[in-house]
């Protein structure tokens, strides 16, 4: 028994080449037509005999050329038919083989979720879908799909007895201010023979788009898959790049890459190399002519940033998307602290030199009220219920403002000497005040907070 390997496309190419030969023969035959009837050079017998001789040779060439052209046409036809026949035979032989393979894989796929022979499917990018496992006997694992923003990459599929593990999918980029998602783990190589899949790259950290807020950490690279008894472990995925920080915020460093996969057996190759950590995010700096001794800063629920300028008695408004100043609000004298109500969204600014608190409507960015408080109004904070607390630096007191009427309620609360900073616990509502001259912190409790105790620091 003998076997013949034929590539139909090569046969088709040979037929095309033979057709070009036939074209050349026809061209030569046409050129020789002029020699079949040669006129005698003179009217004598010798000239007539010579002309007859050349004409006879031309006629013989034409006859032979016609036969060659006919043979060539039949040869080209035979080659073309052979190419089609081989292609049909090849397709016919492939279909039964695929049918046999499908019949073998169907029950195994149904019972175990993976074929006996064949590669696993790749996960869909943008979904974090895991790659399919390769065939139990033979086949490579599918690659994991990349993650959507904030979603980890899919794990690579494992190989069976023989085959390579699939690569882990890349982690999705972090949402604003949040860490990038982790890369997917690489799939294990075949138990007997095969390399582990590489871990997926960690996602980049989310950008810190708001003034003073850092970007997210880069995502951790995926762990490389284990190699088979004979095979090399997959490389760990690279760590994601740290997210870019918001204006005047610290950058975030990238996270280290995933560990490389080790060998499963004593003969296995070396484990993969862990990925490098991502680069730190950049710091954005905003400059503007309206800035004059900027002092306090706060962010409202819509993301707009408010900066007090003590030297120009104004409040600058910054767009968080573009990090540019979009407005300047004329305020009281010596604006210092600024806070935003979590209930109403109103912005409260302390004016150190005029002993007042300005109320700013964030919808129009205009001052809608001025509330008299103690001497040297400096710090300001708002509790979860909406009450506003203002430190009066020269009065050594804290004023409490009712959000319903925007007026001071009750008597000022005595605290330590030279109160400056003030903050509210968002869970308990307890107010903390720093006193710079006696080195203490006053703790104010109650609703609204009234009871005071001081602790030395």
UniProtKB/Swiss-Prot annotation:
Outline the NHL repeats, range by range: 291-321, 333-363, 379-404, 419-447
Q: Which InterPro entries match?
A: Host-pathogen_enzymatic-act (IPR051200), N2O_reductase_N (IPR011045), NHL_repeat (IPR001258), PE-PGRS_N (IPR000084), PGRS_rpt (IPR048996), WD40/YVTN_repeat-like_dom_sf (IPR015943), YVTN_b-propeller_repeat (IPR011964)
Write down a Pfam family by its short name: PE
Name the UniProt key words of this record, in alphabetical order: Cell wall, Repeat, Secreted, Virulence
The phenotype of cells or organisms lacking this gene is: Invasion of the infant human brain microvascular endothelial-cell monolayer is significantly decreased in transposon mutant.
Keyword Transferase tagged: no
Q: Give all residue intervals belonging to the PE domain.
A: 1-92
Recount the UniProt induction comment for this entry.
Answer: Highly up-regulated during the early stages of invasion of the human blood-brain barrier.
Location of the protein in the cell: Secreted, Cell wall
**Domain of life from the UniProt record:** Bacteria
Q: What is its main location?
A: secreted
**Which Gene Ontology cellular component terms are annotated?**
extracellular region
* Similarity comment: Belongs to the mycobacterial PE family. PGRS subfamily.
**Could you tell me which NCBIfam families the record lists for this protein?**
beta_rpt_yvtn (TIGR02276)
Supply the PANTHER family for this chain: DIHYDRO-HEME D1 DEHYDROGENASE, PROTEIN NIRF
Job description of the protein: Enhances mycobacterial intracellular survival, probably via altering host macrophage cytokine profiling and attenuating the cell apoptosis. Could be required for host endothelial-cell invasion. Expression in Mycobacterium smegmatis, a nonpathogenic species naturally deficient in PE_PGRS genes, results in alteration of the production of host cytokines, including IL-6, IL-1beta, IL-10 and IL-12p40, as well as enhanced survival within macrophages largely via attenuating the apoptosis of macrophages.
Q: What is this protein called?
A: PE-PGRS family protein PE_PGRS18
Q: Which organism is it from?
A: Mycobacterium tuberculosis (strain ATCC 25618 / H37Rv)
Name of the gene this protein is made from: PE_PGRS18
């Amino acid at each position: 028994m003998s076997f013949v390997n034929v590539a139909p496309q090569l046969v088709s190419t040979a037929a095309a080449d033979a057709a070009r030969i036939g074209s050349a023969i026809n061209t030569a035959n046409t050129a020789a037509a002029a020699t079949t009837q040669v006129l005698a050079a003179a009217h004598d017998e010798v000239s007539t005999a010579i002309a007859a001789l050349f004409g006879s040779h031309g006629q013989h060439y034409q006859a032979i050329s016609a036969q060659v052209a006919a043979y060539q046409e039949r040869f080209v036809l035979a080659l073309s038919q052979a190419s089609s026949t081989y292609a049909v035979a090849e397709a016919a032989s492939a279909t039964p083989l695929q049918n046999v393979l499908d019949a073998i894989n169907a029950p195994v796929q149904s019972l175990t979720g993976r074929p006996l022979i064949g590669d696993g499917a790749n996960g869909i990018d943008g979904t974090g879908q895991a790659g399919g496992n390769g065939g139990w006997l033979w086949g490579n694992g599918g690659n994991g799909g990349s993650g959507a923003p904030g979603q980890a990459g899919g794990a690579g599929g494992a190989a069976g007895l023989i085959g390579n593990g699939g690569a882990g999918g890349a982690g999705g980029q972090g949402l604003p201010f949040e860490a990038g998602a982790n890369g997917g783990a690489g799939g294990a190589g075949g138990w007997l023979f095969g390399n582990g899949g590489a871990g997926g790259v960690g996602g980049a950290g989310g950008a810190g788009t708001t003034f003073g807020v850092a970007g997210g950490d880069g995502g951790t690279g995926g762990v490389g898959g284990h190699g088979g008894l004979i095979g090399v472990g997959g490389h760990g995925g690279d760590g994601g790049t740290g997210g870019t920080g918001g204006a005047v915020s610290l950058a975030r460093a990238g996270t280290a890459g995933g560990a490389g996969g080790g060998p499963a057996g004593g003969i296995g190759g070396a484990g993969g190399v862990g990925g490098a950590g991502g680069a730190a995010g950049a710091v954005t700096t905003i400059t503007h002519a309206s800035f004059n001794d900027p002092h306090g800063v706060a962010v409202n629920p819509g993301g707009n940033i408010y900066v007090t300028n003590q030297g120009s008695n104004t409040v600058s408004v910054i767009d968080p998307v573009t990090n540019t100043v979009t407005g300047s609000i004329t305020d009281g004298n010596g604006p210092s602290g600024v806070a935003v109500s979590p209930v109403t969204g109103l912005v409260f600014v302390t004016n150190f030199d005029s002993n007042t608190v300005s109320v700013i409507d964030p919808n129009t960015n205009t001052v809608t009220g001025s509330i008299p408080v103690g001497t040297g109004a400096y710090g300001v904070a708002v509790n979860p219920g909406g009450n506003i607390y203002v430190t009066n630096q020269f009065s050594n007191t804290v004023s409490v403002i009712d959000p319903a009427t925007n007026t001071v309620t009750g008597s000022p609360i005595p605290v330590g000497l030279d109160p400056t900073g003030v903050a509210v616990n968002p869970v308990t509502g307890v107010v903390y005040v720093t006193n710079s001259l006696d080195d203490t912190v006053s703790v104010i409790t109650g609703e609204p907070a009234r009871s005071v105790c001081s602790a030395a620091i």
